[in-house]
Amino acid sequence: QKVFGKNSVKPVCPISLSTINRRNIYGETLLHRAVAHQDVDLVRNIIKAGGNVNVQDYAGWTALHKASVEGFYGIANELLKAGADVNARGNEQITPLQDAVKEGHYEVYSKLNTSYSIGI
């Protein structure tokens, strides 16, 4: 049985933890790919199914890093509500907050900074 529809990141059946935790050649999980596709519903479903919001790919990036770099405010908010680590550092020692500032995504920066009082 196929887990994913053709050309889609969305599962066509209930999501198992083995599917959620499966990695591609970059070490990305389904959560990383859902963020990249801006699929907030899939992000929520992965969280509900018990997906780890702090899992890192092979570059050390979490899903929150990706949301911060791309300026995906709504997804960043969902990840934060689920316990995403705002202080997670990738292999280059950059945090999601620093990524948001570097890319000019001040709404995401404000959410990270204000809600979690981390400052820079």
Regions found by a protein language model. Name each.
Residues 42, 74-75, 107-108:
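Conserved ankyrin/ankyrin-like repeat signature
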Residues 13-17, 44-51, 77-84, 113-117:
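Ankyrin repeat domain, specifically the short helix-to-loop turn at the C-terminus of the second helix
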Residues 1-37, 41-49:
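Intrinsically disordered, low-complexity regulatory segments in ankyrin-centric signaling systems
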Residues 33-38, 66-72, 99-105:
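Ankyrin repeat A-helix N-terminal signature
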Residues 90, 108-120:
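Short, compositionally biased segments
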